[in-house]
Amino acid sequence: MAQPFVLLPTEDSHQTLRIQPPSTGIGLRGRIRVPGDKSISHRALMLGAIASGETTIEGLLLGEDPLSTAACFRAMGAEISELNSELVRVKGIGLQNLQEPLDVLNAGNSGTTIRLMMGLLAGQRDRFFCVTGDESLRSRPMARVIQPLSQMGAEIRGRQGNTRAPLAISGRSLQPIRYVSPIASAQVKSSILLAGLTCEGQTTVVEPALSRDHSERMFRAFGAKLTVNPEEISVTVEGPAELTGQPVVVPGDISSAAFWLVAAAIVPDSDLLIENVGVNPTRTGILEALQQMEAQITLENERIVAGEPVADLRVRSSNLQAIEIGGSLIPRLIDEVPILAVAAAFAKGTTIIRDAEELRVKESDRIAVMASELGRMGATISERPDGLEITGGAALTGATVDSYTDHRIAMSLAIAALQAKGQTQIQQAEAAAVSYPDFVPTLQQLLG
C-alpha cells in the first residue's frame, strides 16, 4: 500500500504534506502523548531566567516558538542548558539583571515571546532592546500591549504608529497601574503583570472574561505576591518581586491534543487514549464544546502535577451534533477554533461560532483561511464578522490547500483530510513545527 502520509520538500524551502487516507477504513487506536504545553513552556523559560537560583523544566516543548524564547533570553545573559524534553536547567540572573543584547532579539513566529518580553524589558532600567519577528509576527497588532505599558511609563517605539514590530524598547522605571482590558487576552495580562513585577506597588489587570491563568499559577510558585478576584475577573501583583527558581513539570498541550480528539471523533472505529494532558480549567473550552457536540470524551487518571491539573483523555468515534458557541467560552478555546470547525464539518446540523474576532489577528486570519481552505475540500462553511457558520454533512474531497504558514491551520486541514475522499496536499505544512514538531510522525504512528 502506498504511504498515506508524505512530507515533500518544495523548491521554495517550504514543505507540502500529502495525505491519502487508506481505502479501507482504519480507526485511530492506541495510546499517544502530545508535546509539552506551549504556554507553560514559554513562561517556565522566562521566569526561570529572571529568578534567582536554578529552575528545572521537565517536558519542555521543543517547538520553534519556545526555542525563540530560549534564544532571546540566552542573548540577555540567562544560562539555559541544551534544550530537550527530558530536563532543561535554567540559571536565573535576577529580575532586574537582564543584559543589553548585542543584536536584535528575534521572536520568530511567537506572539507570546514578543508580547511577554515587552512587559519584562520595559522595566529593565537604562538598557535598550530591539525586538522583531518573522513576516507573520511583524504584521500582528502590538498596540494592545504597548498602550497599557505606556501608561506605566514604558518607552516603546514601533512601525505604523507604534503598532507593529520591529520594536525599540528603552528600559525605564515603571509605575503600577490598574488596567481594564478591552479583551480577554492572557498575553496582554501577562505582559502587564511582568512589568508590574518591577514596579513599587500593586499592578492590577481587569478582564472582560477569564483568560488562561498559567502565568498566575507560575508567578505564585516562583514566590510573587499575587491575588485573584474572581468576581471582578482581576489579577493583582505586588512589586518589586523576588523570584526563586523552581522545578517545573510541563504537561501535554491540550491545544495539540485537540487535533486527535477531533480526529478520533470523526474517524469510524476509533478508540484513542491521549496521556498526560494539561486540563487547566481556563483551557478546557475545547472539551466542553466537543462534549456539547456529543463527542465521546472522558477524563481518566485526573491529578495535579506541579500546580497544574492533568488527565488522560479517552475519545471514541462519535456521531457529532451541531452547536452554537460564543461569549466567555471563546477565550478558553480560542486556539482550538480551527480544529473545532473541522469537527463541525462532520456534525449533523449547522454550527455557529460567535465572538471569535480575535482569530483574525492570529498567525493568519483564521476565520477567512478556514472558510476558504475547508471550503476547497467541499465543506459548507462561511465567514461571519466574528466567527464561522458550518453546516455539516457534506462529503469532503481531497484538494490542494494552503496553511498560510499557520501551524494550527496546517494541522486542522490534515485532520480533515483523514475523512476526505482522495488525496489532499497541504502547502507550507512545515508550519506545524511551531507547536508540534512530531505531528506527522504521530499521524504515521496512528494510521501509517
Swiss-Prot record:
GO terms for cellular component: cytoplasm. It comes from the Bacteria. GO terms for molecular function: 3-phosphoshikimate 1-carboxyvinyltransferase activity. Keywords: Amino-acid biosynthesis, Aromatic amino acid biosynthesis, Cytoplasm, Transferase. CDD domains: EPSP_synthase (cd01556). 3-phosphoshikimate binds at residues 38-39, 43, 185, 187, 335, 362. InterPro entries: Enolpyruvate_Tfrase_dom, Enolpyruvate_Tfrase_sf, EPSP_synthase, EPSP_synthase_CS, RNA3'P_cycl/enolpyr_Trfase_a/b. SUPFAM superfamilies: EPT/RTPC-like (SSF55205). It is an enzyme of class 2 (transferase). Pfam families: EPSP_synthase. Pathway: Metabolic intermediate biosynthesis; chorismate biosynthesis; chorismate from D-erythrose 4-phosphate and phosphoenolpyruvate: step 6/7. It catalyses: 3-phosphoshikimate + phosphoenolpyruvate = 5-O-(1-carboxyvinyl)-3-phosphoshikimate + phosphate. It is found in: Cytoplasm. The keyword Nucleus does not apply. The active site is at 335 (proton acceptor). GO terms for biological process: amino acid biosynthetic process; aromatic amino acid family biosynthetic process; chorismate biosynthetic process. The keyword Transferase applies. Its EC number is 2.5.1.19. Phosphoenolpyruvate binds at residues 38, 111, 140, 187, 366, 408. Monomer. Catalyzes the transfer of the enolpyruvyl moiety of phosphoenolpyruvate (PEP) to the 5-hydroxyl of shikimate-3-phosphate (S3P) to produce enolpyruvyl shikimate-3-phosphate and inorganic phosphate. HAMAP family: EPSP_synth (MF_00210). Belongs to the EPSP synthase family. This is 3-phosphoshikimate 1-carboxyvinyltransferase. It comes from Synechococcus elongatus (strain ATCC 33912 / PCC 7942 / FACHB-805) (Anacystis nidulans R2).
